[in-house]
């Protein structure tokens, strides 16, 4: 009775796992449930109870004030925000805690040369510094930094209002709790203008002994704050230690390093201070399309975003302050990644050494197994198998390439706001191409039923060979460019390697069961013979019971063998498919697409992002080839093909820009005082810019036109409050000595000469150098710029002063430009200065 029940159970299981599709669905479903449960945990943010010591509501109130209006460095609102922050920090000093010092840094002036040594930059800093003297005098200080200025076209709630609110909250906490080592806070200005605030701090005396820093930034708008960059593994561990809500990606390190993300943060300044300070760059990165736009306001934020930054930043600062090591710079480059719901950390050199070990040991192990199992080697070297796999991969590559070419030709910016659509399309493209090409190649090769039974194992080995080639390339890139973002290739390769080992175990198991299979065939023959013999017997005779018994045993053995085979298929699938799929999907959804999809309009269009995404998708699905080849029927392929056509047509026709992911058009107005004319320049993203400007009356009435990069038209003159000459230039000469005084009501002015001249001083600060251009930024709107020069010949110069304050009514052309934009378009600054007023002089 027991054997009978066992046989029935095995037959039911074999029936349940009767096809590769059923096995695949089973394995995939189990891991998908585990992944979704873990993803839900990862997606969580800290609750209000975890931030009681940081006074979250007060931080939110700070954020509301800071982001109430645009406050670029060159605006009156910037001064109001600065006064608010300084007053709040002065309150900490007023608590009479002797270890707190607040510094209103209006004394630091810096000068530096451009890389070609021909342009001089002069900048007057006005950072707000707070020093908390630590209990231990032997440990080097830690720096915490954020910038309080915004761009001229955005309210700066994420960039960087939340960073400033977080810094202020942490400052209040340490005003009540003296840190173990010195903590220096730099709430700096003019970050949006070439990181000048951080550069000013780097020349301040408080920066001299800083050993590590935490920089808070906003490279997107809202979402969760991610650890984008880290200098070494030791400071990285400070971020992860005790952090129950981490979000980090080593891809950020490499994206900034390789220029994939073009914008920069104060991190690059602090890291190069003195003896290469170690640090962390924690930044918001989602919704990059409303980054630097008027939608970067508090109405488009969730309190959970601020809570997450406050929690992760305070945790990192606490761990750095409590670190017993004085010098935190003498550690190796970091390496961290998310796998199995946990962040794993190791040093980059160790990761590279492990890669080399895997690259050598893994193929040796597999070659030794092939020597042990020559029958498998005979199968692997069959030309029809090799041709089937190679032709299939070539077909998939061609299909992927054609898909990308058509997509970027007809609707190149569709990925900007429809990343989910493009990702689904690319996954379906590769799934269909793999299934169709493998099936077609196998049919053309006329594989026998015996070949089909072994092709699953063969294709697993071929996929391993493909991954090995990709792995070798990734190892070379990792070593040559010092990249850690190739970890997903390493882990995926190890999955295929493990699966190959599992096939060896199965082959060994199958050999042990050859007798069972042979017995089944023999019994089949006996059954057939017995049935023919029994046809002449009477019903119910004793001879008739023997065939029935043998038939039952044979069917039971078949069910057992079928069950074992299909269980192995599930095991292969679990080891080979889900983890690479989830790993690749995670880096695409969490990092590559959020960081890259909304940057296509920032520079000249390139299809590199599409190619990268579809290549990663192909690699994530290539391991499924051995399964979908036999699992998907012709009807299934037909249904998937119809779905692919639907998605492809939608991707070609959908509007690439939406209200939540708008097209960003950069704006600048040039006002020439000599000719008394002005021209507005708008970045030309064809064909959208011309369609948008056709709604602007100034573009139509002035017969505006466009070239390949810019559209330009005449617009409303700037309003300087009744002044016809907003900029006055006064020159005093004495032999070869020349003093130039510029009054402009602007914090930014440039002077460009037609030849190099000798600079003696700027605003009383000694220079002594030959330059053809100077960029000047000063604290006061109304103080004149003074240049002391020495010249020996006639010199021509062009003076340009910049204006950014859109709420002072100085730039009505920008207000008109924004008023006539459709909801799916946003205006942004082209560079420092929405308005540039210039005048020429001859000396």
Curated annotation (Swiss-Prot):
Residues annotated as catalytic: 191 (proton acceptor)
Amino acids binding Zn(2+) 2: 159, 192, 292
A Pfam family matched in the record: Peptidase_M28
Domain of life: Eukaryota
Obligatory cofactor(s): Zn(2+)
Membrane-crossing residue ranges in chain numbering: 17-37, 348-368, 387-407, 418-438, 457-477, 485-505, 567-587, 609-629, 637-657
Gene Ontology molecular function, alphabetical: metal ion binding; metalloexopeptidase activity
Residues binding Zn(2+) 1: 147, 159, 217
Gene Ontology biological process: proteolysis; proteolysis involved in protein catabolic process
Cytoplasmic side: 1-16, 369-386, 439-456, 506-566, 630-636
Enzyme Commission number: 3.4.-.-
Chain ranges on the Vacuolar side, renumbered to this chain: 38-347, 408-417, 478-484, 588-608, 658-843
Transition state stabilizer (site feature) positions: 291
Subcellular location: Membrane; Vacuole membrane
Keywords per UniProt: Glycoprotein, Hydrolase, Membrane, Metal-binding, Metalloprotease, Protease, Transmembrane, Transmembrane helix, Vacuole, Zinc
Glycosylation (residues): 96, 109, 117, 209, 275, 322, 677, 703, 707, 754, 788
Protein topology in the membrane: Multi-pass membrane protein
Record note on cofactor: Binds 2 Zn(2+) ions per subunit.
A GO cellular component entry from the record: fungal-type vacuole membrane
Family recorded in the similarity comment: Belongs to the peptidase M28 family.
Function: May be involved in vacuolar sorting and osmoregulation.
Name of this chain's protein: Vacuolar membrane protease
């Amino acid at each position: 009775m027991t054997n009978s029940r066992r046989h029935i159970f095995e037959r039911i299981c074999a029936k349940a796992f009767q096809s590769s599709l059923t096995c695949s669905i089973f394995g995939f479903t189990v891991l998908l449930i585990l992944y979704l449960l873990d993803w839900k945990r990862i997606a969580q943010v800290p609750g209000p109870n975890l931030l009681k010591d940081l006074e979250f509501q007060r931080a939110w109130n700070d954020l509301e004030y800071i982001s109430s209006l645009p406050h670029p460095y060159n605006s009156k609102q910037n001064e109001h925000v600065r006064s608010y922050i300084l007053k709040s920090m002065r309150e900490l000093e007023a608590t009479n805690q002797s270890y707190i010092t607040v510094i209103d840094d209006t004394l630091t002036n810096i000068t530096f040369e451009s890389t070609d040594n021909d342009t001089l930059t002069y900048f007057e800093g006005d950072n707000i510094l707070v020093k908390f003297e630590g209990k231990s005098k032997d440990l080097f200080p830690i720096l915490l930094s954020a910038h309080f200025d915004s761009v001229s076209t955005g309210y700066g709630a994420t960039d960087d209002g939340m960073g400033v609110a977080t810094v202020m909250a942490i400052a209040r906490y340490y005003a009540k709790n003296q840190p173990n080592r010195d903590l220096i806070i730099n709430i700096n200005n003019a970050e949006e203008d070439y990181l000048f605030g951080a550069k000013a701090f780097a020349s301040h005396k408080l920066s001299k002994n800083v050993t590590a820093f935490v920089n808070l930034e906003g490279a997107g708008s809202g979402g969760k704050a991610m650890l984008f960059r880290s200098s070494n593994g030791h400071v990285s561990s400070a971020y992860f230690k005790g952090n129950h809500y981490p979000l980090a990606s080593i891809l950020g390190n490499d994206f900034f390093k390789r220029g994939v993300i073009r914008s920069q943060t104060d991190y690059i300044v602090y890291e190069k201070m003195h003896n290469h300070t170690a640090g962390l760059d924690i930044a918001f990165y989602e919704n990059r399309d409303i980054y630097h736009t008027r939608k970067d306001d508090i109405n488009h934020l969730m309190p959970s975003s601020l809570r997450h930054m406050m929690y992760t930043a305070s945790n990192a600062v606490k761990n750095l302050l409590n670190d017993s090591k004085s010098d935190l710079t003498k550690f190796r480059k970091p390496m961290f990644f998310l796998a199995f719901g946990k962040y794993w950390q190791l040093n980059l050199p160790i990761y590279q050494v492990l890669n080399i070990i895997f690259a050598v040991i893994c193929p040796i192990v597999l070659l030794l197994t092939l020597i042990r199992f020559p029958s498998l080697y005979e199968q692997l070297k069959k030309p029809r198998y090799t041709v089937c796999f190679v032709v299939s991969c070539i077909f998939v590559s061609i299909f992927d390439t054609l898909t990308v070419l058509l997509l970027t030709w007809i609707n190149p910016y569709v990925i900007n706001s429809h990343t989910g659509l493009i990702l689904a399309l690319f996954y379906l493209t590769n799934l269909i191409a793999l299934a169709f090409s493998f099936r077609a190649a196998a049919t053309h090769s006329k594989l026998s039923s015996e070949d089909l039974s072994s092709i699953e194992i063969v294709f697993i080995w071929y996929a391993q060979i493909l991954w090995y080639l990709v792995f070798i390339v990734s190892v070379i890139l990792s070593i040559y460019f010092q990249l850690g973002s190739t970890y997903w290739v390493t882990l995926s390769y190890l999955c295929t390697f493990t699966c190959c080992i599992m096939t060896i175990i199965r082959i060994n198991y199958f050999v042990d069961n050859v007798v069972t299979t042979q017995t089944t065939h023999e019994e089949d023959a006996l059954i057939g013979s017995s049935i023919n013999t029994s046809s002449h017997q009477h019903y119910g005779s004793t001879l008739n019971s023997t065939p029935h018994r043998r038939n039952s045993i044979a069917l039971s053995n078949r069910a057992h063998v079928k069950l074992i085979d299909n269980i192995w298929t599930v095991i292969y699938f679990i080891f080979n498919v889900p983890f690479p799929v989830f790993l690749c999907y995670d880096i695409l959804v969490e990092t590559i697409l959020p960081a890259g999809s909304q940057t296509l309009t920032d520079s000249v269009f390139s299809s590199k992002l599409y190619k990268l995404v579809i290549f990663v998708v192909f690699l994530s699905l290539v391991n499924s080839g051995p399964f979908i080849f036999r699992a998907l029927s012709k009807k299934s392929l037909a249904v998937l093909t119809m779905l692919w056509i639907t998605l492809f047509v939608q991707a070609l026709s959908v509007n690439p820009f939406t209200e939540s992911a708008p097209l960003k058009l950069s704006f600048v107005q040039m006002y020439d005082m000599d000719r008394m004319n002005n021209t507005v320049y708008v970045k030309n993203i064809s064909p959208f810019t011309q369609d948008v400007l056709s709604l602007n009356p100034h573009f139509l009435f002035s017969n505006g036109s466009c070239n390949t990069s810019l559209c330009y038209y005449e617009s409303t003159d700037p309003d300087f409050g009744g002044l016809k000459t907003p900029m006055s230039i006064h020159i005093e000469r004495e032999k070869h000595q020349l003093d130039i005084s510029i009054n402009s009501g602007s914090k930014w002015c440039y002077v460009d000469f037609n030849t190099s001249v000798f600079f003696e001083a700027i605003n009383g600060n000694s220079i002594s150098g030959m330059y053809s251009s100077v960029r000047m930024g000063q604290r006061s709107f109304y103080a004149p710029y003074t240049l002391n020069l020495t010249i020996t010949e006639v010199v021509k110069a062009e003076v340009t002063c910049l204006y950014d304050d859109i709420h002072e009514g100085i730039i009505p052309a920008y207000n008109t430009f924004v008023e006539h934009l459709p909801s799916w378009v946003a205006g942004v600054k082209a560079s420092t200065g929405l308005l540039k007023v210039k005048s020429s002089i001859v000396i």
